[in-house]
Amino acid sequence: KAPIGYVVNDNYINISVDTDTAFETDGDTNDAIITVEYSDAPAVGELTVEKKGEVLDGFKGGLFANSEDKEFVYKEGSLAGAVFKVYAAEDIFTADKQKDADGNRTKYYSKGDLVATLTTGKDGKAVAKNLPLGQYKVVEVTAPDGYVLNPNEQTVTFTYVDDKTPVIKESLTFSNDRQKLDMSVTKLDSEDNTPIAGAVFGLYADEDIKNVDGKVIIEKGTLLEKATSDENGKITFVKDYPFAKYVAKEIEKPAGYVTNEEVVNFDTKYQGQDVKTAVYNSEYKNTPTTFEF
C-alpha cells in the first residue's frame, strides 16, 4: 500500500548480494544492512478544457420558401483558437508533506501562480497534464475568432482517489456567444437631410457564403431580405447574418424622389472579442423630383 497521495509502484527490484556489495553494519547486532531506494510517484491531475459555440450550419426555410423567407441556421460546434490560463486557486503542496528550513510545507505552487496556458485545437479541446493535486482556476483570455470573450472563470479540484489511480481526470466546458451583426441604411433627402419613409431595399450576398464545413450555402447575388424605411428613414436587416460581404440596393424608390442607382456595400468583419454586436450603418440619399413649367 502506498502512502496517501501516492500510487503503488508495481515494479520489482532485484537485489544481488556479493562480496562487492556496499553495506552498513548495525551497531547493536553487527548485522549487515543493505539500503535499496524504492520510490512511489504522486497521483496527478489531467484537465481537459473544451470550447463550444454556435457555428453556421445552413440557410433553410419551408419546402417552397424562396431566399427571402429562409433563415440562417446555426448549431453548436467545437471552437479552435481559444486561449486559457490555468492558475493555482490555493496553495498546492507536495504530497510528501515535507517542510522547508522554516518549518513550512513545501509547495508546488502558491495561490495565484500561473500553472499552464492552453490553446484549443480543431476538436475544441486543450489538455493540461501532470497537475499536482489541488484546486485550480481557469480563465479564458482569448476568444476564438468571431466570438465574444467568456468572462466567467471556472474552478476544478483534483482529489486523491486511491493508490491504484495514478491520474485523476476532470473536464470543463466553456461556451462563447457569436458576435452578432447589425446592418442598416438610413434613407435621407439629399437637399435637407430629412428622413424618408417608404423606400424598399434589398440585401444581397456579395460573395458565396459557406457553412462551417466549407459548403456553399448561398451563392453570390442571392437576394436575402427586403426591408422598408420607417418614419426615421431607418432600414434594418433583421436576419441573423454571419460575417461576409453584402450589398444593399434600392429596389422601390419612395414617391416624389428620383431613383438612386448607387449601392451600399457591407464588408463585415469581426470586431474583436470585447464587442457583442458589430454595427454597420450607411446613409443613402435621394433627390426630390422637380418639375419645370
Placement of each model-derived feature along the sequence:
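Solvent-exposed loop/turn and edge beta-strand elements of beta-rich ligand-binding domains
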Residues: 1-293
